[in-house]
Amino acid sequence: MLLVRYLSPPIGAIIFVFEVLKHKRLLVDGWVIAVGSLTSYGVARLLGSTPLAIGSAPTPVLWTFGLVGVLAALCSVLFITLLYGSERFLVRFFPNRALRAVVGGGVVIALGVMNPTALGLGNSTIEELLLFNNAGLWFFISLGVVKLLTTSVTLGSGGSGGIFSPALLIGVAIGGAVGVIAQSPAPVLLVAAMASVVAASVGSPISGALILLEYTQLWEGSGAVAIAVFTATLLMRLLTKETIFTKRLTLLGVDSSSYRVH
């Protein structure tokens, strides 16, 4: 329900759980998820949390959304590879948990010097870029690279953290970079990129798009977002059958299809 608390997408959050898990039991107990999501949304609104509502904005040419989708899929594959690769590397060469945590923390601090905004959840960075996107190409490239590496090292060294927020920041970096190159830094490009990275890396194309559209209220850009998400999802399926979650199950020797709805 933290997703609802920070981004205020009650419907998208419900679909997200069903789309990612596809667990047979959810067909019976799905109402619990719906109640939890809507309750969290209601409490968050009472505490002052609201959707971003960035308003209308010009839509860039369509080829930029196709490019965003391609880059999102490639970065998602890289994200999964780096995440589990860094874990294997650190566990192998630093078997002591305490030492592994120290090494990981040192690497994260060193990487953070390149772009400090890549550290943390990044909610304020995302909102600022959506509302006032005046950053340069180097900022977006360094943001994406540093976030990919710091998230991989943090989780690989035994630290705590999620996947959704890093995926959003990586998406912002992709959308921002494409916007600078195409000389069209529109918010809808960032929204499409965030939705595409979530869709490709987590395996949630429908909820990925819906969550970001609910969050930004940029419904007039839904067609363009759909192009990017479809491109990212299709290319991701061609490149790998794994998502960032199913990869973990595969490494543990668990057949995820045994409890999924087909």
What kind of region is each of these model predictions?
Residues 1-262:
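Alpha-helical transmembrane segments and immediately membrane-proximal extracytoplasmic
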